[in-house]
Amino acid sequence: MEFGIYPNIKKQKIYQYLPKLIKILENQQVKYFVANEAKSKLEEKNIYINPALYKTTEWMGTHLKHILSVGGDGSYLEAAKIFSGYEVFLTGIHLGELGFLNSIKENDTESKIRQLIKQDYVLEERLFLEATILDGENHATKLPVVLNDVVIGKNQIGKMVRLSLWINDNFAQQYPCDGLIISTPTGSTGYAFSCGGPILHSAAQEMIVVPICPHTLAKFSSVLSEGDIVKITLSDREEILHISMDGNGSYDLKKGETLVVQGIRKNIRFVRFKDQDFWEILSDKLVKKI
């Protein structure tokens, strides 16, 4: 068995943990490869790995079946995006804070690696979001595919906007609000949840639309089927708004343009261990820790 390691080199904890992970893999006689972009930073910290074991993410996605994302939830989302087009199994190792998405805790690494080797796990297919900006002449600009959410609003705190929501070309509602979140089931436990949205099981195939601080009695969120197409347009008073994809990057949506979001399926699969129940994890992370 062979593993690809995608480490978050921005986390200081990675430099104490990665040598331990490598030793565990070597003790289990498992071959491993490390993402190329980590090489220089690891060597700065005096962590030296055989240069032949550094590979591009493209190589890893093409040649390997198992990818280990090492870091926090953000690292997991980044790995999901990078490897989404490959037929790989993604497992997250938690070195961050909340760690809702990752399946392996630091102290459980050795036992969970054994489970991976024994194929003692289940695979989940998760919904991704694909977003496109259409200008007035229907020229399309595709944005990066995301696993969590697409958020649109102003860059300034406390500035209300008016956004029109269309579902399958049918007008649904105009929201006076701080913004709108279009979320996958995976993202339903994140920003969407904090704004009052419903929680969906991570393996569900629906999308949700959640208004951020809506100034209206119609404060409801919408649960949409996988095949629905969401369109968002600006009111005449808005000149430009900003789009965030999984909390990263910023893309502009200008007057006269339309944001189109729809759910898509990708080749990647997500590892969940059989002794990990979604609702039990939910209670542990979002209820018991409060």
Annotate each PLM feature.
Residues 5, 69, 182:
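Redox-cofactor binding/interface segments in oxidoreductases and associated redox assembly factors
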Residues 14-15, 74-79, 189-194:
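Short glycine/serine/threonine-rich phosphate/pyrophosphate-binding segments
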